[in-house]
């Protein structure tokens, strides 16, 4: 029997407001434990929450960017559960009247585009963070308690781990472009839980789902879903039954491990938050927030193709993160050829960032210095090969590319007389390669070019070298 995988994702995104959602405590990552919390966050008797207007507007902005309908009336509810990181024994969330609903985003996998529905987006407060000491104790850091969150719940439209990965990439890009969150998974400002079930191929009835947690990277989401699909398939093929449960992805074994039997929404005993009034959002407020939404990834991608003639693939890669897209545009604004700028960012810059495990803002390279180096390639001062030496200096130490080229003696040799002399020496030293080229073996010319480049320490002008070699060979 063949099965179809059905996946839905729940993504929590921390909003980067200056203060928390219901209190004046600062909202910043990395402070010493329990230094960014107050009596409201900790649920002391008699204290009352006050809703952060900026958090509401950030949530609206994200929901609009994800094509959601924005509620005219919405409210907050208490989600009741006991856990050490939840000091009030309830979480202020939204239950039956979310801020946004019926949204969608478009993903692309293997060249095929597909819309993934978004059921709802709602606002809630984050919980504290448990820190396990390893000697039998657990400590609680309440700095995160009360941080404003949006939970983005997808429709069960995702049919493979690859689609889940593409959905998360696109969702992250859109949220980052709006500026409401930095979406750093390593800091917990973007977290994902996945629901997965299997059903017989062709059936429209959903199977029993399991929820996956501890998915700390997009790759772990993909690996966790791949493993869980195989685990469920094995159970079903052997005549077993899937239980509704919550499982944890184990990073060491790359498997999923049972955490608990899954609770239903009735277990949380939701009821309206008595300390917060209904929230009314009129059309004027909606339009003001909508007007603040910047150009989003798809629009930018289209503009790069139409305005600068970039291939679709290049435009897609460059717009995947706002930081890369901004860097690219600034490089072009400083006079670099768009296609050359695209190539350098996609190959050399991205390669360096991946190998060093860094972000663009961590390196010394600037759009101005990259543009300056590209202009040196364009005007023939340096070759692409020499440019890689300049790039290494710029990315590690920064500086003026023109000054680096002069100080290190990297100016490309374009003097025809000087190069012709070297070409003749190379031809005299390699008569067999000359003969091979004359006999139709084009590779021989590449070898001879390499010998000239070697003799000039890579500083010869490659097109001129090719021209001179062909001229001199034809004379022999």
Swiss-Prot record:
| Molecular functions (GO terms) | asparaginyl-tRNA synthase (glutamine-hydrolyzing) activity; ATP binding; glutaminyl-tRNA synthase (glutamine-hydrolyzing) activity
Q: Does the keyword Cell inner membrane apply?
A: no
Its catalytic activity? Answer: L-glutamyl-tRNA(Gln) + L-glutamine + ATP + H2O = L-glutaminyl-tRNA(Gln) + L-glutamate + ADP + phosphate + H(+); L-aspartyl-tRNA(Asn) + L-glutamine + ATP + H2O = L-asparaginyl-tRNA(Asn) + L-glutamate + ADP + phosphate + 2 H(+)
Write down the SUPFAM superfamilies for this protein, in alphabetical order. Answer: GatB/YqeY motif (SSF89095), Glutamine synthetase/guanido kinase (SSF55931)
Supply the alphabetized keyword list: ATP-binding, Ligase, Nucleotide-binding, Protein biosynthesis
Q: Subunit structure, per the record?
A: Heterotrimer of A, B and C subunits.
- Family assignment? Belongs to the GatB/GatE family. GatB subfamily.
The name this protein carries in UniProt is Aspartyl/glutamyl-tRNA(Asn/Gln) amidotransferase subunit B
